[in-house]
């Protein structure tokens, strides 16, 4: 697959690295020689220096024969991204995607208008991240969660604390004990993230302290699993946000709409504070100060908040702020961490949930590199694996025999199936039927092979 990426910023560079590892032919356009030089040290890509809205540059990049064009430059106006995407489509690129920075563009009628113009998808990384944070504040017992088919199935990620009652249990022992405690709960442990590695567990795999368990079940079964693991879901009614970023602005506005009792933003720049105060609803308190100063946080009442969200734009500051918040007794902490090498560090230091803008955006875009049977793709923080939802095509390989007989890739696992209005956990005797929606957990090197089973 030939893919052209416009923009070698954080998201564009991450996409280039990820997609080049998948074996795609990647060309990156940027007007900064420095950014392009940095990218070539970490990814096998062709680079073109120039204006991404130039027809000559787009022709030189090969838009006439490209399968996918991704306009993802955050350093230009969204107009440049939209213009370059439209030009790429006119020049012959099969599908085009553009980054925007205005929520109004994502209103359904506006998205449809751009679709009619030729842009296949618009995405707004900061909006995606803010939605993820809201979800993390709803599910406080998990480090991450994901719904399939509007909640018919749910995947939850649980970090095992040092006092968890399931430590040293094997998968088989856990399954037997959980089934005995709640016979009606169907579930499957589909992966374990341990010390930076992702394991597809076997029956004799034992649970260790700080393991992250990836469990899929019907939504109504998650509370019983949570209780068995020793987790409690805390009702979040007050949130302190450190940093007055664009993400902070969107999160705080959503929280007020959800009628939380208290929402406060701590921002060091007085000009940004004034701007936020003017733009946000009256239910959001904006305080000018340094979120790295623990004395200041105490003065602002950090101990009285149910959750702290750190989105300052500095990974180290976000992680440390969440660690300090936990010491003050805050029940739920969420940190924005853009350096992938710091994600595991943040989790090891006790941060409850980590948001990575590059990862969640990459999942939305990676879907376009697979077959049209993929409904969505999600990268999970703390693991290098991907979660995908497929629709099984008639006559596809996945429908030809029970799962135990189809030689599914070894580093992938089918977690659950949605068939009409019913959902169930997949087992060896399960036979996938045409048009079933299937939840798959896969390591990156197997995704292309998994894709072939559903075509």
Predicted regions, residues:
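Cytosolic regulatory regions of ion transport systems
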Residues: 1-455
């Amino acid at each position: 697959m030939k893919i052209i990426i416009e923009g070698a910023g954080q998201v564009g560079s991450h996409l280039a690295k990820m997609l080049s590892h998948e074996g795609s032919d990647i060309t990156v356009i940027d007007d900064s020689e420095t950014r392009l030089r940095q990218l070539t040290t970490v990814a096998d890509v062709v680079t073109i220096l120039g204006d991404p809205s130039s027809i000559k540059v787009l022709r030189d990049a090969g838009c006439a024969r490209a399968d996918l064009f991704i306009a993802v430059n955050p350093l230009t106006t969204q107009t440049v991204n939209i213009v370059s995407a439209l030009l790429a489509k006119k020049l012959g690129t099969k599908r085009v995607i553009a980054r925007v920075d205005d929520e109004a563009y994502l209103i359904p009628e506006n998205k449809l208008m751009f679709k009619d113009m030729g842009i296949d998808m618009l995405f707004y990384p900061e909006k995606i991240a803010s939605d993820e944070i809201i979800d993390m504040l709803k599910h406080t017992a998990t480090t991450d969660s994901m719904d399939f088919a509007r909640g018919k199935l749910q995947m939850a990620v649980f970090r095992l604390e040092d006092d968890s009652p399931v430590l040293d249990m094997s998968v088989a022992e856990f399954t037997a004990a959980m089934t005995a405690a709640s016979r009606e709960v169907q579930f499957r442990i589909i992966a374990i993230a341990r010390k930076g590695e992702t394991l597809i567990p076997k029956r004799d795999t034992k649970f260790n302290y700080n393991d992250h368990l990836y469990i899929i079940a019907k939504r109504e079964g998650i509370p019983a699993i949570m209780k068995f693991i020793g987790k409690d879901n805390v009702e979040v009614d007050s949130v302190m946000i450190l940093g007055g970023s664009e993400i902070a602005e969107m999160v705080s506005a959503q929280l007020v709409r959800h009628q939380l009792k208290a929402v406060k933003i701590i921002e060091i720049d007085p000009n940004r504070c004034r701007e936020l105060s003017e733009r946000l609803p009256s239910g959001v308190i904006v305080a000018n100060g340094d979120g790295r100063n623990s004395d200041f946080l105490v003065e602002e009442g950090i101990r009285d908040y149910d959750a702290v969200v750190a989105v300052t734009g500095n990974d180290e500051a976000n992680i440390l702020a969440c660690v300090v918040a936990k010491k003050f007794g805050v029940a739920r902490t969420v940190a924005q961490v853009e350096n992938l090498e710091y994600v595991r560090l943040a989790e090891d230091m006790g941060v409850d949930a980590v948001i990575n803008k590059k990862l969640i955006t990459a999942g939305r875009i990676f879907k376009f590199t697979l077959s049209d049977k993929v409904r969505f793709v999600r990268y999970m923080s703390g693991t290098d694996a991907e979660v995908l939802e497929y629709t099984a095509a008639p006559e596809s390989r996945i429908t030809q025999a029970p799962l135990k007989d189809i030689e599914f890739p070894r580093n992938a696992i089918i977690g659950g199936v949605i068939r009409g209005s019913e959902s169930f956990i997949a087992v060896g005797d399960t036979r996938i039927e045409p048009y079933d929606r299937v939840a798959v957990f896969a390591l990156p090197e197997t995704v292309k092979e998994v894709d072939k089973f559903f075509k």
